[in-house]
Amino acid sequence: MNSESVLEEIVLELYRNKLFKIGEYRLTSGKISPYYIDLRILPSYYDIYSKIIDISLSKLEKLNFDIVVGIESAGIIHASFIACKTHKPVGYVRKKPKQHGTKRLVEGIVADRNVLVVDDVATTGGSLEHAVNAVRSMGGIVEKAFVFVDREEGARERLKRLGVELISLMNIWFIINVLVKHRLIDEQTYYLIKNYLNREKHS
């Protein structure tokens, strides 16, 4: 089975297990979206998660990085799995510095290291930009960031302006096209999501 076939099966499993949902959902950015990708509970589905991690590793195997850094909170567990599988150390970036103890924003030794920043889903790229800036402020080198899903709402362009390449396992168009192919969403839903994405792309 080639990688695209594996990804197609992953999309179908995400849909069957209600990790991809249709409806009105408020995102972290405050925007209302006609769909939601809930990858926070993904590790609870071992069969799906192991497939995603394995195919992610094949996508990352040629990259040069010294440490994997996840973004609080969803990105931490994914970064941990990737780090373990690639025999690399792991760290994470907090949303806000600790209010006690060391008061660190970045946990892990990143200075003078090539850092791979990891999160579950990229939307506008705000959380990724925060992580990149935090790691760089500690002397880390960030040239690549990785997510499972790119919602195609500006994150890639935002990171490019920072000199960071966003690598994604799949994007929302791939997911939607798979669901249409298998008749899991109707034409009205397809155009609702398409119009939303086109609007956000140019906002």
From Swiss-Prot:
GO biological process: 'de novo' UMP biosynthetic process; pyrimidine nucleobase biosynthetic process
UniProt cross-references to Pfam families, sorted A to Z: Pribosyltran (PF00156)
Residues the record lists as binding orotate: T123, R151
Cofactor(s), by name: Mg(2+)
Sorted UniProt keywords: Glycosyltransferase, Magnesium, Pyrimidine biosynthesis, Transferase
Transferase found in the keyword field: yes
Sites where the protein binds 5-phospho-alpha-D-ribose 1-diphosphate: R94, K95, K98, H100, D119, D120, V121, A122, T123, T124, G125, G126, S127
MF annotations from Gene Ontology: magnesium ion binding; orotate phosphoribosyltransferase activity
The reaction(s) this protein catalyses: orotidine 5'-phosphate + diphosphate = orotate + 5-phospho-alpha-D-ribose 1-diphosphate
Cross-referenced SUPFAM superfamilies: PRTase-like
UniProt entry tagged with the keyword Nucleotide-binding: no
Pathway: Pyrimidine metabolism; UMP biosynthesis via de novo pathway; UMP from orotate: step 1/2
Superkingdom as given in the UniProt entry: Archaea
PANTHER family: OROTATE PHOSPHORIBOSYLTRANSFERASE, URIDINE 5'-MONOPHOSPHATE SYNTHASE
Family that this chain belongs to: Belongs to the purine/pyrimidine phosphoribosyltransferase family. PyrE subfamily.
Function: Catalyzes the transfer of a ribosyl phosphate group from 5-phosphoribose 1-diphosphate to orotate, leading to the formation of orotidine monophosphate (OMP).
Subunit structure: Homodimer.
Official protein name in the record: Orotate phosphoribosyltransferase
Source organism (scientific name): Staphylothermus marinus (strain ATCC 43588 / DSM 3639 / JCM 9404 / F1)
